[in-house]
Amino acid sequence: MRTSIFFVFSALACAQSSLERDVARAIFKELIEINTTDSVGDNTRAAQAMAARLKSAGFSDSDVVVLAAAPRKGNMIARIHGTGGGKPILFLAHLDVVEARREDWSFDPFTFLERDGYFYGRGTQDIKDEAALYVATFMRLRREGFVPRRDLILALTSDEEGGPNNGVKWLLETHRDLIDAAFCVNGDAGGVQVQGGKRLLLGIQAAEKTFYSFRLEVKNRGGHSSLPEKDNAIYRLSEALARLSRFTFPVRLNPVTQSFFERTGALDNGPDAADFRAVAKAPPDAAAAARLSGRPIYNALLRTTCIPTMLAGGHAENALPQTATATVNCRLVPGDLPDAVQREIVRVLGDPEVSVTPARPSVPSPFSPVPRELLELAGRVGSEVWPGLPVVPLMETGGTDGIYLRVAGVPTYGIAAAFTDLDDIRAHGKDERIAVRAFYDGLDFDYRLIRALGTDTGIK
Protein backbone atom coordinates (compact mmCIF):
# COMPACT_ATOMS: atom_id res chain seq x y z
CA MET A 1 0.00 0.00 0.00
CA ARG A 2 2.81 2.42 0.82
CA THR A 3 4.40 1.60 -2.51
CA SER A 4 1.16 2.40 -4.32
CA ILE A 5 0.81 5.68 -2.46
CA PHE A 6 4.43 6.52 -3.30
CA PHE A 7 3.80 6.03 -6.99
CA VAL A 8 0.61 8.07 -6.86
CA PHE A 9 2.41 10.98 -5.23
CA SER A 10 5.40 10.61 -7.57
CA ALA A 11 3.13 10.77 -10.61
CA LEU A 12 1.37 13.81 -9.19
CA ALA A 13 4.71 15.53 -8.55
CA CYS A 14 5.80 14.85 -12.12
CA ALA A 15 2.49 16.19 -13.44
CA GLN A 16 2.92 19.33 -11.40
CA SER A 17 6.46 19.71 -12.69
CA SER A 18 5.24 19.35 -16.26
CA LEU A 19 2.49 21.89 -15.61
CA GLU A 20 4.93 24.42 -14.19
CA ARG A 21 7.21 23.98 -17.19
CA ASP A 22 4.33 24.48 -19.59
CA VAL A 23 3.31 27.67 -17.79
CA ALA A 24 6.85 29.04 -17.81
CA ARG A 25 7.28 28.23 -21.49
CA ALA A 26 4.00 29.93 -22.39
CA ILE A 27 5.01 33.06 -20.48
CA PHE A 28 8.43 33.04 -22.15
CA LYS A 29 6.83 32.71 -25.59
CA GLU A 30 4.43 35.55 -24.90
CA LEU A 31 7.25 37.86 -23.80
CA ILE A 32 9.51 37.05 -26.75
CA GLU A 33 6.69 37.79 -29.19
CA ILE A 34 6.01 41.24 -27.71
CA ASN A 35 8.48 43.64 -29.28
CA THR A 36 9.97 45.74 -26.46
CA THR A 37 12.72 47.57 -28.33
CA ASP A 38 13.14 51.28 -27.66
CA SER A 39 12.40 52.35 -31.24
CA VAL A 40 9.01 50.75 -31.92
CA GLY A 41 8.40 48.29 -29.09
CA ASP A 42 5.90 48.48 -26.26
CA ASN A 43 7.19 47.71 -22.78
CA THR A 44 3.79 48.63 -21.33
CA ARG A 45 2.11 45.86 -23.30
CA ALA A 46 4.59 43.33 -21.93
CA ALA A 47 4.16 44.66 -18.38
CA GLN A 48 0.37 44.44 -18.67
CA ALA A 49 0.60 40.89 -20.03
CA MET A 50 2.68 39.82 -17.04
CA ALA A 51 0.28 41.57 -14.67
CA ALA A 52 -2.60 39.62 -16.22
CA ARG A 53 -0.69 36.37 -15.74
CA LEU A 54 -0.15 37.08 -12.06
CA LYS A 55 -3.77 38.10 -11.49
CA SER A 56 -4.89 34.85 -13.11
CA ALA A 57 -2.94 33.04 -10.38
CA GLY A 58 -4.76 34.89 -7.60
CA PHE A 59 -2.89 38.18 -7.13
CA SER A 60 -5.23 41.03 -6.25
CA ASP A 61 -5.43 44.24 -8.26
CA SER A 62 -3.84 46.11 -5.34
CA ASP A 63 -0.82 43.80 -5.32
CA VAL A 64 0.00 44.11 -9.03
CA VAL A 65 0.46 47.52 -10.63
CA VAL A 66 1.73 48.80 -13.97
CA LEU A 67 3.25 52.28 -13.94
CA ALA A 68 4.83 54.16 -16.83
CA ALA A 69 7.02 57.24 -17.01
CA ALA A 70 6.04 57.65 -20.67
CA PRO A 71 3.91 55.90 -23.29
CA ARG A 72 5.22 52.41 -24.12
CA LYS A 73 7.55 52.48 -21.08
CA GLY A 74 5.55 50.53 -18.52
CA ASN A 75 6.93 48.82 -15.43
CA MET A 76 5.19 46.06 -13.49
CA ILE A 77 5.48 45.67 -9.73
CA ALA A 78 3.95 42.73 -7.86
CA ARG A 79 4.03 41.83 -4.18
CA ILE A 80 3.56 38.70 -2.10
CA HIS A 81 2.81 39.83 1.44
CA GLY A 82 4.76 38.27 4.28
CA THR A 83 4.32 38.11 8.03
CA GLY A 84 6.37 41.24 8.67
CA GLY A 85 9.61 39.54 9.62
CA GLY A 86 11.81 42.18 8.00
CA LYS A 87 12.16 44.55 5.06
CA PRO A 88 11.11 43.12 1.69
CA ILE A 89 13.30 41.35 -0.84
CA LEU A 90 13.18 42.72 -4.39
CA PHE A 91 13.55 40.51 -7.47
CA LEU A 92 14.43 42.46 -10.61
CA ALA A 93 14.42 41.84 -14.35
CA HIS A 94 13.99 44.17 -17.32
CA LEU A 95 11.50 43.63 -20.12
CA ASP A 96 13.11 45.76 -22.81
CA VAL A 97 15.48 44.31 -25.41
CA VAL A 98 17.99 45.70 -27.88
CA GLU A 99 17.08 46.26 -31.50
CA ALA A 100 16.95 43.27 -33.86
CA ARG A 101 16.55 43.47 -37.64
CA ARG A 102 14.85 40.63 -39.51
CA GLU A 103 17.44 40.75 -42.29
CA ASP A 104 20.25 40.10 -39.81
CA TRP A 105 18.66 36.96 -38.37
CA SER A 106 18.00 33.50 -39.78
CA PHE A 107 14.33 33.91 -38.75
CA ASP A 108 12.01 36.50 -37.24
CA PRO A 109 13.66 37.63 -33.97
CA PHE A 110 10.23 38.33 -32.45
CA THR A 111 8.81 34.87 -33.12
CA PHE A 112 9.49 32.32 -30.39
CA LEU A 113 11.14 29.24 -31.87
CA GLU A 114 12.16 25.93 -30.30
CA ARG A 115 14.67 23.98 -32.36
CA ASP A 116 17.32 21.34 -31.62
CA GLY A 117 17.23 21.83 -27.86
CA TYR A 118 17.21 25.65 -27.89
CA PHE A 119 14.69 28.46 -27.52
CA TYR A 120 15.37 31.25 -30.05
CA GLY A 121 14.28 34.89 -30.11
CA ARG A 122 15.36 38.38 -29.12
CA GLY A 123 15.57 38.43 -25.33
CA THR A 124 16.05 34.71 -24.77
CA GLN A 125 19.39 35.48 -23.11
CA ASP A 126 18.93 39.13 -22.15
CA ILE A 127 16.73 38.77 -20.16
CA LYS A 128 13.16 37.77 -20.90
CA ASP A 129 14.15 34.29 -19.78
CA GLU A 130 14.60 35.54 -16.23
CA ALA A 131 11.46 37.69 -16.37
CA ALA A 132 9.44 34.64 -17.41
CA LEU A 133 10.98 32.50 -14.67
CA TYR A 134 10.21 35.10 -12.00
CA VAL A 135 6.59 35.45 -13.13
CA ALA A 136 6.11 31.68 -13.28
CA THR A 137 7.63 31.29 -9.81
CA PHE A 138 5.53 34.06 -8.24
CA MET A 139 2.43 32.46 -9.79
CA ARG A 140 3.35 29.07 -8.34
CA LEU A 141 4.01 30.50 -4.89
CA ARG A 142 0.62 32.25 -4.94
CA ARG A 143 -1.19 29.08 -6.01
CA GLU A 144 0.56 27.13 -3.25
CA GLY A 145 -0.49 29.69 -0.66
CA PHE A 146 3.10 30.38 0.36
CA VAL A 147 3.39 33.10 3.01
CA PRO A 148 6.99 34.35 3.39
CA ARG A 149 8.45 35.88 6.52
CA ARG A 150 8.71 39.21 4.70
CA ASP A 151 7.27 40.70 1.55
CA LEU A 152 8.61 39.50 -1.79
CA ILE A 153 8.53 42.12 -4.56
CA LEU A 154 8.87 41.50 -8.29
CA ALA A 155 9.77 44.43 -10.57
CA LEU A 156 9.86 44.07 -14.36
CA THR A 157 11.14 47.31 -15.81
CA SER A 158 11.84 49.38 -18.92
CA ASP A 159 14.83 50.92 -20.68
CA GLU A 160 17.66 49.00 -19.06
CA GLU A 161 19.18 48.59 -22.52
CA GLY A 162 18.96 52.31 -23.25
CA GLY A 163 16.35 54.96 -23.81
CA PRO A 164 15.28 57.95 -21.73
CA ASN A 165 12.93 56.22 -19.27
CA ASN A 166 14.92 53.77 -17.19
CA GLY A 167 12.34 52.04 -15.05
CA VAL A 168 14.43 51.39 -11.96
CA LYS A 169 15.72 54.96 -11.83
CA TRP A 170 12.22 56.36 -12.31
CA LEU A 171 10.65 54.08 -9.70
CA LEU A 172 13.30 55.02 -7.15
CA GLU A 173 12.63 58.70 -7.81
CA THR A 174 8.83 58.59 -7.88
CA HIS A 175 7.56 55.37 -6.26
CA ARG A 176 10.36 54.17 -4.02
CA ASP A 177 7.93 52.68 -1.52
CA LEU A 178 6.88 50.11 -4.12
CA ILE A 179 10.38 48.69 -4.58
CA ASP A 180 12.22 49.63 -1.38
CA ALA A 181 13.87 46.53 0.02
CA ALA A 182 16.47 45.14 2.38
CA PHE A 183 18.29 43.88 -0.70
CA CYS A 184 17.68 43.03 -4.35
CA VAL A 185 18.24 39.84 -6.33
CA ASN A 186 19.00 40.95 -9.89
CA GLY A 187 18.26 38.42 -12.62
CA ASP A 188 20.46 40.34 -15.06
CA ALA A 189 23.80 39.29 -13.60
CA GLY A 190 25.72 36.50 -11.93
CA GLY A 191 24.46 32.95 -12.03
CA VAL A 192 25.98 29.71 -13.22
CA GLN A 193 29.08 30.03 -15.37
CA VAL A 194 29.37 27.29 -17.97
CA GLN A 195 32.09 26.76 -20.55
CA GLY A 196 32.33 23.94 -23.03
CA GLY A 197 29.31 22.33 -21.42
CA LYS A 198 31.01 22.20 -18.00
CA ARG A 199 29.50 24.07 -15.06
CA LEU A 200 32.27 26.01 -13.32
CA LEU A 201 30.68 28.00 -10.50
CA LEU A 202 27.62 29.83 -9.25
CA GLY A 203 28.46 33.51 -9.30
CA ILE A 204 26.88 36.13 -7.07
CA GLN A 205 27.42 39.50 -8.71
CA ALA A 206 28.00 42.03 -5.95
CA ALA A 207 29.76 44.78 -7.90
CA GLU A 208 29.80 46.20 -11.40
CA LYS A 209 31.86 48.72 -13.24
CA THR A 210 30.45 52.16 -13.93
CA PHE A 211 29.85 53.17 -17.56
CA TYR A 212 31.33 56.65 -18.09
CA SER A 213 32.25 58.22 -21.43
CA PHE A 214 34.42 61.22 -22.23
CA ARG A 215 34.53 63.38 -25.36
CA LEU A 216 37.98 64.29 -26.65
CA GLU A 217 38.08 67.24 -29.05
CA VAL A 218 40.70 69.14 -31.02
CA LYS A 219 39.83 72.38 -32.81
CA ASN A 220 41.79 74.00 -35.65
CA ARG A 221 41.38 76.95 -37.99
CA GLY A 222 41.30 74.54 -40.94
CA GLY A 223 41.91 75.61 -44.52
CA HIS A 224 42.13 74.27 -48.07
CA SER A 225 43.35 70.70 -48.40
CA SER A 226 45.64 71.72 -51.28
CA LEU A 227 47.69 73.66 -48.73
CA PRO A 228 48.23 71.10 -45.95
CA GLU A 229 49.85 71.94 -42.64
CA LYS A 230 51.45 69.77 -39.99
CA ASP A 231 49.13 71.28 -37.39
CA ASN A 232 46.15 69.10 -38.27
CA ALA A 233 43.27 68.38 -35.89
CA ILE A 234 43.06 64.73 -36.93
CA TYR A 235 46.82 64.20 -36.55
CA ARG A 236 46.77 65.83 -33.14
CA LEU A 237 43.86 63.76 -31.88
CA SER A 238 45.40 60.58 -33.30
CA GLU A 239 48.69 61.21 -31.51
CA ALA A 240 46.84 61.81 -28.23
CA LEU A 241 44.89 58.58 -28.65
CA ALA A 242 48.11 56.70 -29.35
CA ARG A 243 49.45 57.89 -25.99
CA LEU A 244 46.24 56.74 -24.32
CA SER A 245 46.59 53.31 -25.95
CA ARG A 246 49.94 52.82 -24.20
CA PHE A 247 48.56 53.67 -20.77
CA THR A 248 47.18 51.20 -18.24
CA PHE A 249 45.34 52.16 -15.08
CA PRO A 250 46.74 50.66 -11.88
CA VAL A 251 45.36 47.48 -10.36
CA ARG A 252 42.51 48.27 -7.98
CA LEU A 253 40.79 45.35 -6.28
CA ASN A 254 37.82 45.61 -3.96
CA PRO A 255 36.58 42.99 -1.49
CA VAL A 256 34.42 41.39 -4.20
CA THR A 257 37.16 41.00 -6.83
CA GLN A 258 39.70 40.03 -4.18
CA SER A 259 37.36 37.26 -3.02
CA PHE A 260 36.72 36.20 -6.63
CA PHE A 261 40.41 35.71 -7.41
CA GLU A 262 41.06 34.06 -4.06
CA ARG A 263 38.19 31.57 -4.36
CA THR A 264 38.71 30.76 -8.04
CA GLY A 265 42.42 30.33 -7.37
CA ALA A 266 41.58 27.72 -4.77
CA LEU A 267 39.17 25.93 -7.12
CA ASP A 268 41.13 26.11 -10.36
CA ASN A 269 43.96 23.73 -11.19
CA GLY A 270 44.70 25.39 -14.52
CA PRO A 271 47.69 27.54 -15.47
CA ASP A 272 46.08 30.73 -14.13
CA ALA A 273 45.36 29.39 -10.63
CA ALA A 274 48.66 30.48 -9.09
CA ASP A 275 48.28 33.96 -10.58
CA PHE A 276 44.73 34.20 -9.20
CA ARG A 277 45.99 33.47 -5.71
CA ALA A 278 48.97 35.81 -6.06
CA VAL A 279 46.92 38.74 -7.32
CA ALA A 280 44.45 38.28 -4.45
CA LYS A 281 47.16 39.04 -1.91
CA ALA A 282 47.68 42.47 -0.37
CA PRO A 283 49.36 44.06 -2.20
CA PRO A 284 48.60 42.18 -5.44
CA ASP A 285 51.60 40.48 -7.00
CA ALA A 286 52.70 42.73 -9.88
CA ALA A 287 54.04 39.93 -12.09
CA ALA A 288 50.86 37.90 -11.69
CA ALA A 289 48.74 40.95 -12.47
CA ALA A 290 50.80 41.63 -15.59
CA ARG A 291 50.28 38.08 -16.85
CA LEU A 292 46.55 38.12 -16.16
CA SER A 293 46.24 41.53 -17.82
CA GLY A 294 47.06 39.87 -21.13
CA ARG A 295 43.56 38.35 -21.06
CA PRO A 296 40.81 40.94 -21.68
CA ILE A 297 38.41 39.51 -19.10
CA TYR A 298 40.96 39.50 -16.27
CA ASN A 299 42.39 42.87 -17.29
CA ALA A 300 38.89 44.32 -17.01
CA LEU A 301 38.42 42.81 -13.55
CA LEU A 302 41.71 44.19 -12.27
CA ARG A 303 41.35 47.87 -13.12
CA THR A 304 39.48 50.77 -14.65
CA THR A 305 39.66 50.70 -18.45
CA CYS A 306 39.25 53.47 -21.04
CA ILE A 307 39.05 52.79 -24.76
CA PRO A 308 38.12 54.92 -27.80
CA THR A 309 34.89 53.69 -29.37
CA MET A 310 33.87 56.46 -31.81
CA LEU A 311 35.71 58.92 -34.06
CA ALA A 312 34.63 61.92 -36.14
CA GLY A 313 36.52 64.65 -37.94
CA GLY A 314 36.38 67.16 -40.74
CA HIS A 315 33.50 68.60 -42.71
CA ALA A 316 34.56 68.16 -46.35
CA GLU A 317 37.06 65.98 -48.20
CA ASN A 318 38.74 69.01 -49.76
CA ALA A 319 39.07 70.99 -46.51
CA LEU A 320 41.48 70.73 -43.60
CA PRO A 321 39.58 69.59 -40.51
CA GLN A 322 38.43 72.27 -38.12
CA THR A 323 37.47 69.70 -35.51
CA ALA A 324 38.29 66.11 -34.65
CA THR A 325 36.51 64.26 -31.86
CA ALA A 326 36.67 60.88 -30.17
CA THR A 327 34.44 59.18 -27.66
CA VAL A 328 36.41 57.33 -25.01
CA ASN A 329 34.33 54.85 -23.05
CA CYS A 330 35.56 54.08 -19.55
CA ARG A 331 34.45 51.34 -17.19
CA LEU A 332 35.29 52.43 -13.67
CA VAL A 333 35.88 49.95 -10.87
CA PRO A 334 34.09 50.74 -7.60
CA GLY A 335 36.14 53.35 -5.76
CA ASP A 336 37.54 55.12 -8.83
CA LEU A 337 35.91 58.54 -9.19
CA PRO A 338 35.09 60.10 -12.58
CA ASP A 339 36.90 63.37 -11.81
CA ALA A 340 40.08 61.49 -10.95
CA VAL A 341 39.83 59.38 -14.10
CA GLN A 342 39.30 62.51 -16.19
CA ARG A 343 42.38 64.15 -14.67
CA GLU A 344 44.41 61.02 -15.41
CA ILE A 345 43.29 61.00 -19.04
CA VAL A 346 44.26 64.67 -19.39
CA ARG A 347 47.67 63.88 -17.90
CA VAL A 348 48.24 60.92 -20.22
CA LEU A 349 47.18 62.80 -23.35
CA GLY A 350 49.70 65.48 -22.47
CA ASP A 351 48.30 68.09 -24.86
CA PRO A 352 46.35 71.14 -23.69
CA GLU A 353 44.86 71.46 -27.18
CA VAL A 354 42.91 68.23 -26.60
CA SER A 355 39.89 69.01 -24.45
CA VAL A 356 38.40 66.25 -22.30
CA THR A 357 34.79 66.60 -21.14
CA PRO A 358 32.20 64.13 -19.81
CA ALA A 359 30.08 62.85 -22.69
CA ARG A 360 27.82 60.48 -20.81
CA PRO A 361 28.27 60.92 -17.08
CA SER A 362 26.81 58.52 -14.54
CA VAL A 363 26.95 57.97 -10.81
CA PRO A 364 29.66 55.56 -9.63
CA SER A 365 28.24 52.43 -8.04
CA PRO A 366 29.60 51.02 -4.78
CA PHE A 367 30.02 47.29 -4.25
CA SER A 368 27.58 45.34 -2.09
CA PRO A 369 29.21 43.34 0.72
CA VAL A 370 28.01 39.74 0.44
CA PRO A 371 26.69 38.36 3.74
CA ARG A 372 28.01 34.93 4.67
CA GLU A 373 24.41 33.80 5.15
CA LEU A 374 23.57 34.63 1.52
CA LEU A 375 26.59 32.72 0.24
CA GLU A 376 25.61 29.71 2.30
CA LEU A 377 21.95 29.82 1.27
CA ALA A 378 22.80 30.21 -2.42
CA GLY A 379 25.26 27.34 -2.08
CA ARG A 380 22.65 25.05 -0.54
CA VAL A 381 20.03 25.89 -3.15
CA GLY A 382 22.52 25.66 -6.00
CA SER A 383 23.68 22.23 -4.86
CA GLU A 384 20.10 20.96 -4.95
CA VAL A 385 19.97 21.72 -8.67
CA TRP A 386 23.66 21.44 -9.63
CA PRO A 387 25.41 19.27 -7.01
CA GLY A 388 28.86 20.36 -5.91
CA LEU A 389 28.84 23.74 -7.63
CA PRO A 390 30.97 26.28 -5.70
CA VAL A 391 29.62 29.77 -4.97
CA VAL A 392 31.86 32.74 -5.79
CA PRO A 393 31.22 36.50 -5.40
CA LEU A 394 32.09 38.40 -8.55
CA MET A 395 32.18 41.77 -10.26
CA GLU A 396 30.87 42.09 -13.79
CA THR A 397 32.58 44.35 -16.28
CA GLY A 398 29.34 45.48 -17.89
CA GLY A 399 26.54 47.43 -16.29
CA THR A 400 23.01 46.66 -15.09
CA ASP A 401 20.21 48.46 -13.29
CA GLY A 402 21.84 47.31 -10.08
CA ILE A 403 23.88 50.52 -10.22
CA TYR A 404 20.80 52.63 -9.42
CA LEU A 405 19.79 50.43 -6.51
CA ARG A 406 23.25 50.33 -4.96
CA VAL A 407 23.57 54.11 -5.20
CA ALA A 408 20.15 54.36 -3.52
CA GLY A 409 21.37 52.22 -0.64
CA VAL A 410 19.79 48.90 -1.65
CA PRO A 411 22.45 46.14 -1.70
CA THR A 412 22.07 44.23 -4.96
CA TYR A 413 23.19 40.71 -5.82
CA GLY A 414 23.08 39.30 -9.33
CA ILE A 415 21.94 35.68 -9.26
CA ALA A 416 20.63 34.75 -12.71
CA ALA A 417 18.99 31.34 -12.83
CA ALA A 418 19.05 30.49 -16.54
CA PHE A 419 22.63 30.07 -17.69
CA THR A 420 24.37 30.38 -21.06
CA ASP A 421 27.58 28.69 -22.10
CA LEU A 422 30.40 31.23 -22.28
CA ASP A 423 31.16 29.86 -25.75
CA ASP A 424 27.63 30.66 -26.94
CA ILE A 425 26.99 34.23 -25.79
CA ARG A 426 24.49 35.72 -28.25
CA ALA A 427 22.90 38.48 -26.19
CA HIS A 428 22.49 41.61 -28.37
CA GLY A 429 23.55 39.51 -31.37
CA LYS A 430 22.22 37.39 -34.20
CA ASP A 431 20.03 34.33 -33.53
CA GLU A 432 19.96 34.83 -29.76
CA ARG A 433 19.11 31.60 -27.96
CA ILE A 434 19.11 29.69 -24.68
CA ALA A 435 19.27 25.96 -24.11
CA VAL A 436 15.90 24.44 -23.21
CA ARG A 437 17.48 22.53 -20.34
CA ALA A 438 19.11 25.69 -18.98
CA PHE A 439 15.74 27.44 -18.95
CA TYR A 440 14.02 24.64 -17.04
CA ASP A 441 16.95 24.22 -14.66
CA GLY A 442 16.60 27.94 -14.01
CA LEU A 443 12.91 27.49 -13.24
CA ASP A 444 13.78 24.89 -10.61
CA PHE A 445 16.55 27.05 -9.15
CA ASP A 446 14.47 30.25 -8.98
CA TYR A 447 11.62 28.47 -7.21
CA ARG A 448 13.96 26.99 -4.62
CA LEU A 449 15.91 30.25 -4.20
CA ILE A 450 12.91 32.55 -3.82
CA ARG A 451 11.17 30.19 -1.43
CA ALA A 452 14.34 29.78 0.65
CA LEU A 453 14.93 33.54 0.80
CA GLY A 454 11.32 34.07 1.80
CA THR A 455 11.70 31.59 4.64
CA ASP A 456 15.16 32.61 5.85
CA THR A 457 15.58 34.99 8.78
CA GLY A 458 19.36 35.29 8.89
CA ILE A 459 19.94 37.60 5.91
CA LYS A 460 19.37 41.22 6.81
Walk through the language-model features, giving the residues of each.
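A non-catalytic alpha/beta surface segment that caps or lines the substrate-entry region
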Residues: 37-86, 109-113
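Histidine/acidic-residue-rich, glycine-tolerant segments that coordinate divalent metal ions
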Residues: 149-232
